[in-house]
């Protein structure tokens, strides 16, 4: 089955979501699909090298193999998408681009949640957030990590008169 994103834009997340739901429905952890793009459809992404960079940047996809037809107008990627990775990246993207709050109950000791936090930080550092909000988002994220990582039973950190931190 070929999944075609003719516009070659970031609406491809809908395509990825379909793939992720198929994985969940079939009880698999990994799904391999053909991902087909018409190279010449959008002048912004003319050329296989640009399309390759675009597909490689899509959250949740890992390129296994690629090929271009003999006319150079269609580019086919064989991609793997991983269920846990996809959903972790999706949550991280929601936090960075849509300013969605991190779940208050997020437990940083849970390995899956820790992956979401790492990926969120990765997205902030790589410029996925809006430029005007990048620094503020980064500060908010670090503060959120700090708040989540603190044990509520411990007293807050204070500074003595001579500048020494104590708990």
Label each residue range with its predicted role.
Residues 18-22, 117-125:
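Hydrophobic, repeat-rich solenoid/adaptor surfaces of innate immune receptors and signaling proteins
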